[in-house]
């Protein structure tokens, strides 16, 4: 299982470039280990401690050959470099097609379904897209073991397009080069990444800072809160 992820993500006009280093423990003895990554993303290289590793790609499955047998309980690290666009058809394979394709209506409007967004103005990557490599096969209709859940530590660096702000789990900080870092206080199962023209509104109470981020032009709530400002 993976106990540590170190990411770097660069947003581009219509896709993204990423490098992810994973550190983990072998749950079984083997030389070849299985990872899952969205099939729309192209793996450029895989290495371990600077040494290139052979790998085979079959849609979402990436088989990585470490070149030597790792015993159960051994620790190892592996780095993926990849880029591209998310393939939405891979999302929610565990949900029956008739449920996914069922019409959703609100009054006269058909509500479309979109699992991620990749444009020059907005990026949204949720865990269901498998936008970063994860150990195992992802969904399987033959073995329920794919549903195993592990908690990992995440450290994320993001370089957004000019004028945009990234958001993810953990406290975010930016440097003079416009690179943002996020690091959670506790391990989590998965993480998401959103990048857009976000604006922050904050209030401090009892030494705790509460913040809301909204897209520019989407502040539909501040005026309604004026009358209770002293209460909240």
Task: Please report, for each region that a protein language model flagged, where it lies by residue.
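Extended, low-hydrophobicity, Ser/Thr/Pro/Gly-biased non-transmembrane segments
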Residues: 81-192
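N-terminal, polar/Ser/Thr-rich
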Residues: 1-17, 44, 49, 116, ...
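Juxtacatalytic substrate-recognition/specificity segment
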Residues: 20-22, 156, 181, 199-232
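Beta-strand-rich interaction surfaces with strong enrichment in secreted/lumenal proteins
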Residues: 7-9, 22, 51-54, 65-70, ...
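Intrinsic-disorder/low-complexity, polar/charged segments enriched in Ser/Thr/Lys/Arg/Asp/Glu/Gln
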Residues: 4, 15-21, 30-32, 61, ...
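Surface-exposed beta-strand/loop patches in extracellular or lumenal glycoproteins
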Residues: 17, 21-40, 140-146, 150-161
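A surface-exposed beta-strand-loop module
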Residues: 33, 38-108
């Amino acid at each position: 299982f993976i106990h540590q992820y170190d990411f770097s993500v660069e947003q581009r006009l219509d896709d993204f470039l990423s490098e992810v280093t994973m550190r983990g423990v072998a749950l079984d003895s083997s030389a070849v280990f299985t990872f899952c990554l969205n099939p729309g993303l192209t793996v450029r290289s895989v290495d371990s401690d600077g040494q290139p590793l052979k790998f085979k790609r079959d849609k979402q499955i990436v088989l990585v050959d470490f070149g030597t047998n790792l015993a159960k309980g051994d620790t190892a690290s592996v780095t993926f470099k990849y880029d591209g666009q998310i393939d939405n058809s891979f999302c929610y394979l565990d949900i029956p097609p008739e449920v996914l394709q069922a019409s959703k209506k609100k009054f006269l409007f058909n509500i479309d379904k979109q699992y991620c967004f990749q444009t020059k103005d907005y990026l949204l990557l949720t865990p269901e897209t498998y936008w970063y490599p994860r150990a195992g096969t992802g969904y399987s209709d033959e073995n329920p073991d794919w549903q195993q859940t592990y908690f990992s530590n995440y450290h994320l660096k993001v370089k957004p397009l000019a004028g945009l702000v990234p958001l993810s789990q953990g406290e975010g900080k930016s440097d003079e080069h416009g690179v943002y870092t996020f690091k959670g206080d506790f391990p989590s199962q998965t993480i998401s990444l959103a990048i857009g023209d976000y604006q922050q509104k904050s209030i401090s109470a009892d030494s705790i800072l509460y913040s809301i981020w909204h897209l520019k032009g989407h502040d539909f709530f501040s005026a309604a809160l004026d009358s209770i400002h002293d209460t909240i």
